[in-house]
Design a protein with these regions (language model features):
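Contiguous, small/hydrophobic- and glycine-enriched helical/loop subdomains that border
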Residues: 109, 113-150
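ATP-binding N-lobe of GHMP and related small-molecule kinases
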Residues: 2-100, 118, 122-127, 154, ...
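Glycine/serine-rich anion-binding loops at beta->alpha junctions
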Residues: 91-120, 138, 245-260
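Residue-level signal for inorganic ion chemistry
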Residues: 16, 44-46, 71, 105, ...
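Hydrophobic C-terminal alpha-helix "anchor/cap" residues
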Residues: 35-38, 133, 239, 273
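Conserved, helical-rich catalytic subdomain that frames metal- and/or nucleotide-binding sites
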Residues: 145, 150-246, 261-264, 270-274, ...
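Short, basic/glycine-rich phosphate-binding loops at helix/coil junctions
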Residues: 50-64, 112, 207-217
Length: 290
């Protein structure tokens, strides 16, 4: 049995490419996406306790810390799987923007599965953790896998890809809330003028061709979210006007990420975005592999 304390970094993710192929009869959308973890992360400290309680504390005042938190849900699923023998106290340092389309909750859940597995003496393989993690959320298995991956089906079919070549990123989250359900409900799959070249992007990743990746950035959900929230398009345009190689909305939004060919350009653009749009959640980071 493991014991003591474990500290885990839980990394955010962005979608380099997001395509929706069709709406299935069960109401879910069939997707084809390239997912990528980035340097921006939350930090979680786990302490094993013997009272079989799940206790969560955080430096963020914006999150539920009860059974509605994905950390709690992940702990519950893990303890059910192994037959609970201990409890856990979790402290979450929140750095990933909340409700931003960056899997902030899912990555915290993934870190919880990994830490509890370690504290329990590794009863589950990574494959097993990914299998049970889907009970907590569709993005959680990917957040356990990390790195660069192709995601298909309704997001549950994952294929690991080689790491993307290093790049400097600016992440900017406007101060608005976007409902993922609203975006998918209003997406007109049959009326899309164009689809991102996910296969071409995968080929570029496999050739370590960063330019080929950046010029193929695409997200069909922009067709819904940007008309509803024009500031997203304005932030993208500001990134491009300030030296970005390309820029895209991540997931269902509202976060925008932009790729730069130097850290200096990224820092300058971040400063410009902060001042022009009065944004607090603007970060300079990079692609992050395992």
């Amino acid at each position: 049995m493991g014991n003591g304390q474990i500290i885990k970094d839980a990394h955010a993710k962005i979608n380099l490419g997001l395509d929706v192929l069709r709406k299935r009869e069960d109401g879910y959308h069939e997707v084809k996406m390239i997912m990528q973890t980035i340097g921006l992360h939350d930090t979680l400290t786990f302490k094993r306790t013997e009272d079989e309680e799940i206790v969560i504390e955080s430096d963020s005042g914006k999150l539920p810390l009860d059974e509605h938190n994905l950390i709690y849900k992940a702990a519950k699923v893990f303890f059910e799987e192994i037959g609970q023998a201990f409890g856990v106290h979790v402290f979450l340092e929140k750095r990933i923007p909340i409700a931003a389309g960056m899997a902030g909750g899912s990555t915290d859940a993934a870190a919880t599965f990994e830490a509890l597995n370690e504290l329990a003496g590794f009863p589950c393989s990574q494959e097993k953790l990914m299998e049970i993690a889907v009970r907590v959320g569709a993005d959680v298995p990917y957040c356990i896998m990390k790195g660069t991956a192709l995601s298909e089906g309704i997001g549950e079919i994952l294929t690991a890809l080689p790491p993307v070549a290093p790049a400097n990123l600016v992440i900017a989250k406007p101060d608005i809330d976007v409902s993922t359900a609203f975006v998918y409900k209003n997406l007109k799959v049959n009326e899309l003028d164009s689809h991102p070249d996910i296969d071409g992007m995968r080929a570029a990743i496999e050739k370590n061709d960063l330019q080929g990746v950046t010029e193929r950035l695409g997200n069909v959900l922009e067709t819904v979210t940007i008309p509803a929230h024009p500031i997203i398009g304005q932030i993208k345009a500001c990134c491009m006007a300030n030296g970005a190689v390309n820029a895209l909305m991540s997931g269902s939004g509202p976060t925008v990420f932009a790729i730069f060919d130097s850290p200096v350009k990224a820092e300058q653009a971040a400063e410009k975005i902060r001042s022009e749009f009065q944004l607090h959640e603007v970060y300079v980071t990079e692609f992050w592999g395992q």
